[in-house]
Amino acid sequence: MKRTVEVNESILRVWFEGCKDVKIMNRKWCADTTTTTILLVYCQHVIDHTKLKQAIAPEMCNDLLQSSFKDSNLLASNSQFSVTTLELENSNENVSRMLFEGKLLIIFQEYKRGYTIDIAKLPTRSIEQSNTEMTIRGSRDGFVEELSTNIGLIRKRLKTSSLSYDEFIIGERTQTKVGLLYLKDVASQETISQVQFKLKEINIDGVVSSAQIEEFITGDQFSLFPLIEYTGRPDYAVNCLLHGRFILLVDGSPTATIAPVSFPFFVNTAEDQNYFYLFGSFVRLLSLFGIAISIFLPGFWVALVTYHPDQIPYTLLATLSLSREGIPFPAPLEGMIMITLFELLRQAGLRIPAAFGQTLSVVGGLIIGQAAISSGFVSPSMVVMIAISVVSTFTLVNQSFTGTLSILRYGVFLMSSFLGIVGFICSILLIVIHVANLRSFGLPFLAPYSPPVFSSMLPSTFRIPFTRMKKRPKELHTYDNTRQRTNNDENK
């Protein structure tokens, strides 16, 4: 931007030629005996028009003239708005970002100075409970699409100066703000430096989803499993920060990205901290059991029925033989049809309006399953096994992990269909080998089981009482490993 209002106005009109909502006004303003030419620039859809009228009121302009447009601190102290000095050499990208963030640009001709006044009124959504992470005893406020609001939800829970916040602008066109939060005296500095470097290296024209950031920072390693967790609950995000993890908040996304994570972390839920520890442990074990059932039950059943019927008890075998009488498809094809059918119902339930989604998944499955049995297309035993497998996936909150279970279910089922129990065992080995090679910001995905960290195995598997949670997870290599000090520790 040049040093005269006329040149600035012409440049700005070229920059925003196709933006009819950007208003550029050249006005002469008189206060006392002084007259100056003022250039006002703003975007009408992201500002508060009431504040706009107040910002250019005679009283404020009089203060500007009295300060000779040189003392921005005096200007800010006399104004009820947030006033900062505008560098006239700012690039198109910087000026665009300021305008579309809701700032009013004021440029004075005689004094060759400019200011920005924050009069933003951006479209926002009120804070409400997360739809995917329901709670009974926990807090009912959830993240929204506004970055500053989300940071405030975390700040009000962590009232400490050790909570560091780094901000990055990513996307040449979207100029999206990405916030990195961590406890500087707890989190591993090596991990923080790694994620900071990866965020700075991102060079993309636009960011519209936090999933884009996740893919950039996790690298190019092939993984069927998600290497990052997400949550819509601030209380759970704070709990992760206290454990030594970091959080990414993306402007426009109502979820927080959490890393580093390992496999046991995905069976934890935000509600675990509000349960009695025995029930919380039971829920975690149930989730682990649900994961195993979801992946392996259909494959194991089809291998048993197709290749090893001699291992089935005679009473059950007789029942299965009667139920399969008249079925036109072999067991593997029958199972594949039912798995695909249930997946279609589940995906349809996720995409139609919430009021009908639950009904479609449950009632639709019952009606279609019963109709398939009555018509003789599938056997009742196969419907039961596939239904149990699909329902078991709902023990998890993370939809990315749920999608992984669906893919693995297909893989295990196909190998078991072709090779029987041998294929079933080989599929288990392949999954274990794949998982053992995964890393989330240096953290092994099977930690603390492989490599073994015995002090963290029990807390990762069970929800132990808070009185026993004296140390942070050792596998995270935190700077401060102590969570709870006893009276004896304080006296030392």
UniProtKB/Swiss-Prot annotation:
<feature type="transmembrane region" description="Helical">
    <location>
        <begin position="377"/>
        <end position="397"/>
    </location>
</feature>
<feature type="transmembrane region" description="Helical">
    <location>
        <begin position="246"/>
        <end position="266"/>
    </location>
</feature>
<dbReference type="InterPro" id="IPR004995">
    <property type="entry name" value="Spore_Ger"/>
</dbReference>
<feature type="transmembrane region" description="Helical">
    <location>
        <begin position="413"/>
        <end position="433"/>
    </location>
</feature>
<dbReference type="Pfam" id="PF03323">
    <property type="entry name" value="GerA"/>
</dbReference>
<protein>
    <recommendedName>
        <fullName>Spore germination protein XA</fullName>
    </recommendedName>
</protein>
<keyword id="KW-0812">Transmembrane</keyword>
<keyword id="KW-1003">Cell membrane</keyword>
<feature type="transmembrane region" description="Helical">
    <location>
        <begin position="325"/>
        <end position="345"/>
    </location>
</feature>
<feature type="transmembrane region" description="Helical">
    <location>
        <begin position="285"/>
        <end position="305"/>
    </location>
</feature>
<keyword id="KW-0614">Plasmid</keyword>
<dbReference type="GO" id="GO:0009847">
    <property type="term" value="P:spore germination"/>
</dbReference>
<keyword id="KW-0309">Germination</keyword>
<dbReference type="GO" id="GO:0005886">
    <property type="term" value="C:plasma membrane"/>
</dbReference>
<comment type="similarity">
    <text>Belongs to the GerABKA family.</text>
</comment>
<feature type="transmembrane region" description="Helical">
    <location>
        <begin position="353"/>
        <end position="373"/>
    </location>
</feature>
<feature type="transmembrane region" description="Helical">
    <location>
        <begin position="442"/>
        <end position="462"/>
    </location>
</feature>
<keyword id="KW-0472">Membrane</keyword>
<keyword id="KW-0843">Virulence</keyword>
<keyword id="KW-1133">Transmembrane helix</keyword>
<dbReference type="InterPro" id="IPR050768">
    <property type="entry name" value="UPF0353/GerABKA_families"/>
</dbReference>
<comment type="function">
    <text>May allow B.anthracis to germinate within phagocytic cells and therefore involved in virulence.</text>
</comment>
